[in-house]
């Protein structure tokens, strides 16, 4: 057994060595310049014409005529840095500040007998979204190792604010899937002709952090100083751009989740429970003749959802689990179309400015199917319609305005809102 594994390891090393030598002979830079710095960010202001009380779903009638509420947010600000070491080796990093980052301060409280107190000044997150080392053998064969993006679904692959029309990321995918989904792992990817392909090996999701409203969305990453790796998962993505202006994509994920917890149970009651997560996704983009049309459909299935729900509800109150019912199936689908009015005006053709009028429709339900004996939170399923404008004074900057309306089950109150935002995405400097 050991000798067989050693033999395979030596063969793999030999192949790697030969490919590496060939890449060194070419010595062609991976990036246009050795060092690249870029990023993206967005600021959004929203007024929601519905109550934000936490009981608005359990007691909908009491909040039917409740006043609305406004919010101003910095959903994402990201700094990206890439470096080409040469000989086919490169580095990619991305640091994300969500909702303005986080701040804390220590103060002396005069009303607390002069005691020192630590206070949270700003709520938010700072996260390392990408950190990988890549070896490029050829255009068709690249090996990426480290903290990488999991490109399942449209939004995880195309998540910059210039790649969707709405002020916030598409709500359906970002509700049921981790978004942006980033994880420690290994990725093999490449391009050949009109095809791009990628296969990944990752640690499994953590089933104790599955929830009703967000299904598996909060189960990637880790609340600890390390990522639990008791189970492994696989993911893939295939894109085809053979037709000019059209991209067609398939992606998917499969992996067990139940044992991927800090203290996995050994109880006979849960013997054989795996909590296998399976996700299939199709998305596309058409961009030609002043028209952009994008669409996606995602379907996910979780085995042993009943056992996982019961296990999570039995955990301690101070655990990382939300201790909620978890659905066996979740779904999200959406389509959006935008037309560039400036592109139809002769005097504006050939200029960087664009003015899109768009509409978007989506349906999603994080509790699409629920195992018998579990409560179904029907407010988790909804339709959402949005319409608005995107003005690009230049390619890297966009100003957005949007009206949206969320249509829930008739026993709940609908959720209309208006939003305005400004965003950028691009390289800060190009030559070093």
Question: Model features per residue range: what roles?
Answer:
Residues 1-9:
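Bacterial N-terminal signal peptides that target proteins for export
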Residues 28-48, 67-207, 230-235, 239-247, ...:
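Outer membrane beta-barrel
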Residues 31-33, 45-75, 215, 221-224, ...:
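Surface-exposed strand-loop-strand hairpins of Gram-negative outer-membrane beta-barrel proteins
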Residues 50-52, 63-66, 116-121, 131-134, ...:
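Outer-membrane beta-barrel pore domains
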């Amino acid at each position: 057994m050991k000798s067989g594994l050693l033999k395979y390891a030596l063969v793999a090393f030999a192949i790697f060595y030969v490919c590496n030598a060939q890449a060194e002979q070419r010595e062609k830079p991976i990036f246009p310049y050795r060092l690249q710095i870029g990023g993206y960010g967005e600021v959004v202001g929203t007024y929601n014409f519905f109550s934000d009380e936490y009981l608005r779903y359990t007691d909908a009638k009491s909040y039917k005529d409740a006043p609305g509420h406004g919010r101003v947010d910095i959903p994402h600000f990201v700094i990206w840095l890439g470096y080409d070491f040469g000989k086919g080796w490169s580095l990619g990093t991305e640091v994300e500040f969500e909702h303005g980052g986080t701040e804390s301060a220590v103060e002396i409280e005069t009303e607390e007998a002069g005691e020192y107190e630590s206070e949270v000044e700003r709520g938010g997150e700072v996260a390392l979204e990408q950190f990988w080392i890549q070896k490029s053998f050829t255009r068709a064969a690249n090996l990426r190792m480290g903290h990488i993006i999991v490109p399942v679904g449209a939004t995880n692959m195309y998540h910059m604010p210039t790649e969707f029309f709405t002020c916030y990321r598409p709500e359906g995918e970002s509700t049921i899937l981790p978004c942006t989904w980033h994880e420690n792992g290994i990725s093999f990817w490449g391009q050949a002709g009109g095809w791009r392909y990628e296969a990944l090996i990752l640690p499994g999701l953590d089933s104790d952090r599955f929830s009703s409203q967000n299904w598996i969305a909060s189960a990637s990453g880790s609340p600890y100083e390390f990522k639990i790796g008791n189970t492994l998962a696989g993911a893939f993505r295939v894109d085809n751009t053979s037709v000019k202006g059209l991209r067609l994509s398939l992606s998917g994920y499969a992996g067990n989740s139940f044992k991927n917890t800090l203290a996995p149970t050994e109880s006979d009651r849960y013997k054989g429970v795996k909590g296998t997560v399976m996700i299939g996704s199709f998305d596309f983009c058409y961009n030609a003749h002043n028209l952009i049309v994008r669409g996606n459909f995602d379907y996910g299935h979780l085995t042993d959802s009943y056992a996982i729900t019961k296990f999570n509800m039995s955990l301690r109150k101070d655990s990382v689990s939300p201790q909620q019912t978890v659905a066996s199936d979740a779904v999200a689908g959406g389509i959006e179309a935008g037309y560039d009015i400036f592109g139809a005006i002769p005097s504006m053709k050939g200029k960087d400015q664009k003015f899109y009028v768009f509409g978007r429709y989506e349906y999603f339900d994080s509790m699409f199917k629920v195992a018998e004996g579990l409560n179904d939170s029907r407010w988790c399923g909804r339709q959402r319609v949005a319409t608005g404008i995107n003005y690009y004074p230049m390619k890297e900057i966009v100003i957005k305005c949007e009206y949206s309306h969320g249509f829930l089950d008739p026993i709940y109150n609908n959720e209309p809102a208006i939003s305005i935002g400004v965003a950028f995405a691009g390289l800060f400097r190009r030559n070093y």
